[in-house]
From Swiss-Prot:
Gene3D superfamilies: 3.30.70.330. NCBIfam families: PRK05738.1-3 (NF004359), PRK05738.1-5 (NF004360), PRK05738.2-4 (NF004363). GO terms for biological process: translation. InterPro entries: Nucleotide-bd_a/b_plait_sf (IPR012677), Ribosomal_uL23-like (IPR013025), Ribosomal_uL23/eL15/eS24_sf (IPR012678), Ribosomal_uL23_CS (IPR001014). It comes from Rhodopseudomonas palustris (strain ATCC BAA-98 / CGA009). One of its GO terms (cellular component) is ribonucleoprotein complex. Disulfide bonds: none annotated. The keyword Ribosomal protein applies. PROSITE patterns: RIBOSOMAL_L23. This is Large ribosomal subunit protein uL23. HAMAP family: Ribosomal_uL23_B.
Length: 99
């Protein structure tokens, strides 16, 4: 049995299911919402261990929080860090199933 470090579950927060990420999945890419301080090597290791796949590359981006009005007052949403993970040929992740 493979040993999974519990910290891997802290790195990967959730899959991102949008129209754009669904189109990227056709090119062997998966998009995840990740912890704000996570580095590319940490993300790569976590995805490889949790999903038992081989990762080719990891690209990250930070989506800045938007200002929204709520009941007459303005607030700011939190920033969200995302990782676009490119998988090696022959490897797939189905984000609709759980771990």
């Amino acid at each position: 049995m493979k040993s999974i470090d519990p910290r891997h579950y802290d790195v990967i927060v959730a899959p991102v299911v949008t129209e754009k990420s669904t189109m990227a999945s056709e090119h062997n890419k998966v998009v995840f919402k990740v912890q704000g301080g996570a580095t590319k090597p940490q993300i790569k290791e976590a995805v490889e261990k949790l999903f038992d796949v081989k990762v080719k590359s990891v690209n990250t981006l930070v989506r800045k929080g938007k200002t929204k009005a709520f009941r007459g007052t303005f607030g700011t949403q939190s920033d969200v860090k995302r990782a676009v993970v490119t998988l090696e040929e022959g490897h797939r992740i189905d984000v609709t199933t759980g771990l």
